[in-house]
Every structure is written in C-alpha cells, then in structure tokens.
Regions:
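RNase H-like nuclease fold core
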Residues: 1-46, 58
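Residue-level detector of functional hotspots within protein domains
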Residues: 35, 51-53, 97-99
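Metal-dependent nuclease catalytic cores in nucleic-acid-processing enzymes
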Residues: 46-63
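C-terminal functional segments of enzyme domains
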Residues: 3-5, 10, 24, 65-68, ...
C-alpha cells in the first residue's frame, strides 16, 4: 500500500503482522518499518503485485501454502494473466507475466491465494482508511 506520504511501500507479513520481507531472495532492502519502499514512480497496484510475487517467493522458502491479499485487481485478474496491455507500462506488464507464471507453479504444488478484506489484513498498511 501507500506509505506515510513518501510513495509506495510493499509489506508481506505473517498472520500476527510480523514482516517476512527479510526473507526475500531478491536482495530488496527492507526499511525500519519492515517494508520495501518503491518510491513515487510506481503505482499502488504495482506494489500490491510485487507484494504477491514476494509472498509466493517467501512461501516457497517456508513451505507455507496459503497467501492472503486485499487487492481484487491483483488476486482475481493480474495474477491470472488478465489485463489490458494498452493501459499499463512495460514494468507492470513484465511483473504481471512473472506473477502469473509463479502463481501457476504455486497452485500446482498445492498453494492457494485468497482475498481478504484490508480491514483484517495484517499486512495492510492502513494509510487509506
């Protein structure tokens, strides 16, 4: 989600709200708050998509089989390869294709991705409330 008026941040947590991003295998640096700061040139939807990608990456390391997210767009459309190419930039399209492939593999191995309301999502940054 968006964070503290400084741009987009990504947060991935366990059910208790503890950040899991230290386990990301991409070397993305985690800030003091346990989030990855993307700056102001990425959209919130891009951040949500990257969050799902990172969550699947972390789940593959930990053996977790359930991932929850609060973005309808990412969970029900983009991560299934459903998007309008003409309305998105190349970075977002590239990430959509990676997430779609990763989701297929995650689900083939018994993984599930489910929607949860932002009101009860422990990873929700809460700045939109």
């Amino acid at each position: 989600g968006t964070g503290r008026g400084i741009g987009v941040e990504v947060r991935v947590t366990d059910l208790k709200g503890t950040s899991l991003l230290e386990k990301n295998s991409f070397g993305l640096s985690v800030n003091f708050y346990g989030n990855i700061h993307l700056g102001t040139d990425k959209t919130n939807n891009y951040g949500e998509l990257l969050g799902l990608y990172l969550a699947m990456d972390i789940a593959s390391q930990t053996g977790d089989k359930k991932i929850f997210g609060d973005s309808n767009l990412v969970i029900f459309f983009w991560s299934k390869g459903l998007f309008r190419k003409d309305s998105l930039n190349e970075d977002t399209i590239s990430l959509i294709l990676k997430v779609t492939e990763k989701r297929k593999n995650f689900e083939k191995t018994g993984g599930k991705i489910e929607y949860v309301s932002g009101d009860i999502n422990p990873a929700d940054l809460g700045f939109h409330k």
